A protein has these predicted regions:
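Surface/interface-facing alpha-helical segments and adjacent flexible terminal/loop regions used
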Residues: 1-53, 57-113
Length: 113
């Protein structure tokens, strides 16, 4: 059982190392969604801390907006209100999936020129 766990961990680490920034963000949202579904305050909070730490304040307006949203989610989780955080994380995940799809579509169009 321990060997299988080590293999699984190694595979996950390798997968994460090959993801682009948008894919990493989507993975973080997936982890937050899972934690909220399980009502796991510790993991949900840890995901939100990672999301906050990943903000790029070179883009002040969007970073500040996301910071306020993540901070709000953190407070709601501390109150035991996982449902609103779950909804927000799902919506943000969907948005970033659309961004990823748009970037891939644009890359394909550019490469076919």
């Amino acid at each position: 059982m321990i060997a299988a766990k080590k293999i699984s961990t190694a595979y996950l680490e390798q997968e994460i190392m090959t993801l682009n920034p948008v894919q990493l963000l989507i993975k973080a949202y997936d982890a937050g969604i899972t934690a909220c579904n399980r009502r796991d305050e510790s993991k949900a909070s840890a995901v939100l801390v990672e999301l906050i730490d990943s903000l790029n304040f070179d883009y002040v307006e969007i970073a500040n907006s996301l910071f306020r949203l993540y901070d709000y989610c953190m407070r709601e989780i501390k109150r035991g209100n996982f449902d609103i955080t779950l909804k927000i994380l799902k919506e943000l995940r969907e948005t970033w999936l659309q961004v990823q799809d748009n970037v891939q579509t644009e890359a394909l169009q550019t490469s076919s020129l």
